[in-house]
Amino acid sequence: MAIERTLSIIKPDAVAKNVIGKIYDRFESAGLKIIASRMAHLSQNEAEQFYGVHKDRPFFKDLVSFMISGPVMIQVLQGEGAIAKNRDLMGATDPKKADKGTIRADFADSIDANAVHGSDAPETAAVEVAFFFPGMNVFNR
């Protein structure tokens, strides 16, 4: 497997529950390195830009409102097969359908307040990482 980078966001619901450290432990225990991180309170414009791919979907407005409702923790994860590994750690989008022991099964409340975001492909990962960490703000470890 190739070494990959992926973007991960710990969403406002999980930040409010004070489980950032528990989620970071899962990343690191799975062999993923956190190579960049920052806390941010997204503006409406930032959330609309980041989730722009969904702008014509019925849930777009609610997604943007949720993502600006409180601070988020944004990180870049690196490791072998990082994209798939992170998606496995996250679990299904709907926490009720997520496998036991996944981040969403353990920390999410609903399909909307589902604790985490993760890139779904190498192409989207590159775009998402560049969106939040432009230039030289990401470091190999």
Curated annotation (Swiss-Prot):
Instruction: Give the binding site residues for ATP.
Output: K11, F59, R87, T93, R104, N114
State the family named in the UniProt similarity comment for this chain.
Belongs to the NDK family.
Q: Which Enzyme Commission number(s) are listed?
A: 2.7.4.6
Superkingdom: Bacteria
Q: What is this protein called?
A: Nucleoside diphosphate kinase
Q: Which organism is it from?
A: Polynucleobacter asymbioticus (strain DSM 18221 / CIP 109841 / QLW-P1DMWA-1) (Polynucleobacter necessarius subsp. asymbioticus)
Write out the GO biological process terms.
CTP biosynthetic process; GTP biosynthetic process; UTP biosynthetic process
Give the enzyme's main class according to its UniProt record, as a single word: transferase
Tell me, what's a Pfam family for it? Answer: NDK
